[in-house]
Regions:
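Residues forming the flavin
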Residues: 1-53, 57-163, 167-543
């Protein structure tokens, strides 16, 4: 197979134009072309308003050797092997009990998917509801403010990413093919095929919800089981020559209002970044963990049209997608300020999961067609900023900010104009930017939520961003808070076997501190499944 890299095409090109360009580049006739597939696609707007698509394309031809002799171009590679991923089952150790996966976010879901596909018959435990009921619970919360502690934006089938922009890009280095396998599985279960080649793939909360459901059906059809409303509240261990080994899980069924014990040889803790009670429980059992740096800040909203013109030029074609952006700044105080989880044509959402605490996030539907662009603007914080060196001190740091946000908005999302934020005064009216928020909101002084070093860093960072995207620091840009769940505040220590010191416990995904975002969490879930399959033979149910 031949790969053509860095091929620029006019933004309005047709598929026929595309094929003609391939034929010309490879100096072949149409009958010599057997097929082609887009490998990567991105938009080049560096010379706006002149815009291009930039492609990498994999091409099959009748006689590759002939083309190789004829064409001399350093952007063309020959004898490319197709992407392939291989899940190897080589474990010999017998499982006494079915493997258990705690959490059905991307890490848990993909771990369960791979184990089910290869005969391990996993049990997936999810404290929240299935995605259909969860959606109803979340929409009810946004409408009336009554929070369901186990079925909300953070907890339930699909994890926190279900109510997000559904971004699928990752910066994780991947020589094993896990990244492409994640995208392939998503596409196989209902996501658009374009996610496999777009430079910044996303599917939106509406499509992601449907894909998650189809993946669950696959798991169940291949011998797996998914138990909703099932929260792990405790573990039981036994000792073997001084080594703690997992023996049982204590599970609370919130629908039946009853507790039961589940025997298991191993449990994958893919619990997500908001499972603070589970972090605490594991700490009480002596599972090694450490605080880690993360970032906190606000959501900021601008008109999407302003962002489109900044990115594409004033007279951009209407068929282009809502434009994204990514901005960073290093401040004189040594801290970094950057945008995170930018949602073109999206919504700010009340993403709370604890009583009397309030957190926000960003979300987009697949069409990305709201009038506003929003992003988190966040400031790095490290364990040095926490009040103690306790492993869970970062959790308490988050909680204090969320409590302040709840009080500032009287239980609603506190909202402020950026100009008022700079002047440290509460907003009393909106400007030309109307908030697009899922959930009730109230004008307030968002600056009151933060320590001064965070507030000053946010102000300085946003003003720097204005030099990169004109209008970014406009006085009527709408900010809301608090963006506190950007990543896990703790890392659950695991060794090369991916287990903790309590053998049989596999910390996994974003909550455990080993991923950041949907795709990297899914990849870590696959990696954990691979490790289990390298030790254990597929589960055999006793007849």
């Amino acid at each position: 197979m031949i790969r053509i890299n860095q091929r620029k095409r006019n933004i309005e090109h047709t598929s026929d134009d595309f094929e003609r360009k391939i034929l010309k580049t490879l100096c072949i006739k149409k009958e010599e072309l057997q097929g082609f597939q887009i490998r990567k696609q991105s938009i080049d707007a560096r010379k706006k308003p002149v815009l291009y698509y930039v492609y990498s394309v994999d091409v099959q031809v009748r006689d590759e050797a002939k083309v190789k002799k004829t064409v001399k171009n350093n952007q063309i590679q020959f004898q490319i092997k197709p992407d392939s991923y291989h899940f190897e089952v080589k474990g010999t150790k017998e499982l006494t009990h079915r493997p258990v996966i705690i959490g059905t976010g991307p890490a848990g879901l993909f771990c369960g998917y791979m184990l089910a596909a290869h005969g391990y018959q996993p049990i997936l435990l999810e404290r929240g509801a299935d995605v259909d009921q969860r959606t109803k619970d979340v929409e009810a919360f946004w409408e009336n403010g009554r929070l369901n502690l186990s079925s909300n934006v953070q907890f339930g089938e699909g994890g926190a990413g279900t109510f997000s922009d559904g971004k699928l890009n990752t910066l994780v280095k991947d020589k094993f093919g896990r990244n492409h396998e994640v995208l392939r599985i998503f596409a196989e279960h209902g996501a658009p095929e374009s996610i496999t080649y777009e430079s910044k793939p996303h599917i939106g909360t509406d499509v992601l919800s449907a894909v998650v459901k189809e993946m669950r059906k696959y798991i169940c059809a291949h011998g797996g089981e998914v138990r909703f409303h099932s929260q792990v509240t405790d573990i039981q261990t036994h000792s073997d020559n001084g080594q703690k080994i997992l023996r049982k899980l204590k599970i609370y069924d919130s629908q039946k209002k009853e507790t039961y014990l589940l025997d298991t040889d191993l449990a994958v803790f893919a619990i997500g970044h908001s499972a603070r009670d589970t972090f605490s429980m594991l700490y009480q059992h002596g599972l090694p963990m450490q605080p880690k740096a993360f970032a906190v800040g606000v959501r900021i909203e601008h008109p999407q049209e302003m962002i489109n013109q900044d990115q594409y030029g004033k007279n951009y074609p209407s068929f282009l997608p809502a434009a994204p952006y990514k901005l960073t700044a290093n401040l004189d105080n040594g801290r970094g300020v950057y945008t995170f989880c930018m949602c073109p044509g999206g919504y700010v959402v009340n993403a709370s999961s604890e009583e009397h605490r309030l957190a926000v996030n960003g979300m987009s539907y697949s069409r990305r067609d709201s009038q506003n662009a929003n992003t988190a603007v966040i400031v790095t914080v490290s364990p040095d900023d926490f009040e103690s060196d306790h492993p869970l001190a970062g959790v308490e740091f988050q909680r204090k900010l969320e409590e302040a946000a709840y009080l500032e908005g009287n239980g609603k999302v506190p909202v402020q104009l950026f100009g008022d934020f700079c002047e440290n005064r509460p907003s009393v009216q909106l400007g030309r930017v109307t908030p697009h928020i899922k959930g009730m909101y109230q004008l307030a002084n968002v600056r009151n939520i933060f320590p001064e070093f965070i507030a000053e860093s946010l102000t300085e960072g946003i003003q720097i961003f204005d030099h990169k995207l004109p209008g970014y620091a406009r006085c009527d840009a709408v900010i809301s808070g608090v963006e506190s769940r950007t990543s896990s505040p703790v890392r659950l220590i695991r060794d090369q076997s991916l287990q903790s010191e309590i053998r049989g416990i596999y910390p996994c995904g974003e909550g455990a501190g080993y991923a950041g975002g949907i795709t990297s969490a899914a990849m870590d879930g696959i990696k954990t499944a691979e490790m289990i399959a390298s030790v254990y033979h597929p589960f055999k149910m006793e007849s």
